[in-house]
């Protein structure tokens, strides 16, 4: 049997098996774990009462987090004319049209989010095999295909959680970083959960928000009291 590292032993000692934490307790535990060699993100998983095999129960969206994510986000925008200028004014890192598509086809992918004006989709659509597998393809359901590209850039720069329910009925989202205050994480988690409730499929029956888990990149997943977040 492999020996536990010093860090693994410290983590095991810090958590209580089967405990259901308040959000503040979970943040405190994760913030006090031995530091990793890089800045860890804090991630939330929410188990939803949906059947993702049914197309009308696929929950997908984007939530602008009031306390941000703690990460610098590079944004590429497909737009031209006034829309392109507005995107630049909001701090878009890369703005283009056919030239941007050509650059991406050449392997230049130095960005985290891609936003497109509707008239640019004829160009962006040809990049599906490049952007799709990387989760970068613009989609109106998450606000990245929009005539208001400037506002989309603003939201992306502010820090957004983008999510899509997986096969197990769970959404996963980065909600901040280790070192964020409990208050900041609460703002972000409550905003995310509120948006998830708005996205509840009409055909979803029974309990919708079933379980919430908070974790750090290299740390354990801590079960959070759903009522502590949703009430």
From Swiss-Prot:
Residue stretches in coiled coil: none
Gene encoding the protein: rplA
Domain of life from the UniProt record: Bacteria
UniProt entry tagged with the keyword Iron: no
Role noted for this protein: Binds directly to 23S rRNA. The L1 stalk is quite mobile in the ribosome, and is involved in E site tRNA release.
Quaternary structure, from the entry: Part of the 50S ribosomal subunit.
UniProt protein name: Large ribosomal subunit protein uL1
Lineage, broadest ranks: Bacteria, Pseudomonadati, Pseudomonadota, Gammaproteobacteria, Moraxellales
CDD domains: Ribosomal_L1
Pfam family, one: Ribosomal_L1
Cellular component annotations (GO), alphabetically ordered: cytosolic large ribosomal subunit
GO terms for MF: rRNA binding; structural constituent of ribosome; tRNA binding
Family: Belongs to the universal ribosomal protein uL1 family.
InterPro entries attached to this UniProt entry: Ribosom_uL1_bac-type, Ribosomal_uL1, Ribosomal_uL1-like, Ribosomal_uL1/biogenesis, Ribosomal_uL1_3-a/b-sand, Ribosomal_uL1_CS
Keywords: Repressor, Ribonucleoprotein, Ribosomal protein, RNA-binding, rRNA-binding, Translation regulation, tRNA-binding
BP-aspect Gene Ontology terms: regulation of translation; translation
Entry annotated with the keyword Ribonucleoprotein: yes
């Amino acid at each position: 049997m492999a020996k536990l590292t010093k860090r693994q032993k410290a983590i095991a000692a810090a958590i209580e098996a089967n405990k259901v934490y308040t959000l503040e307790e979970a943040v405190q535990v994760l913030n006090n774990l031995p530091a990793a060699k890089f800045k860890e993100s804090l991630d939330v998983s929410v188990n939803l009462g949906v059947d993702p095999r049914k197309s009308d129960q696929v929950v997908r969206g984007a939530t602008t987090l009031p306390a941000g994510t703690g990460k610098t986000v590079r944004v590429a925008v497909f737009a031209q004319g006034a829309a392109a200028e507005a995107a630049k004014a909001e701090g878009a890192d890369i703005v283009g049209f056919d030239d941007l598509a050509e650059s991406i086809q050449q392997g230049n992918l130095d960005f985290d989010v891609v936003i497109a004006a509707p008239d640019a989709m004829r160009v962006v659509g040809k990049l599906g095999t490049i952007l799709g597998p990387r989760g970068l393809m613009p989609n109106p359901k998450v606000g990245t295909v929009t005539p208001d590209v400037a506002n989309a850039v603003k939201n992306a720069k502010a820090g957004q959680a983008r999510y899509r329910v997986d096969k197990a009925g769970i959404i996963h989202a980065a909600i901040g970083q280790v070192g964020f205050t409990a208050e900041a994480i609460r703002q972000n988690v409550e905003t995310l959960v509120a948006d998830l409730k708005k996205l509840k499929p009409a055909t979803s029956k029974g309990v919708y928000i079933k379980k919430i888990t908070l974790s750090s990149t290299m740390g354990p997943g801590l079960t959070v009291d759903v009522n502590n977040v949703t009430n």
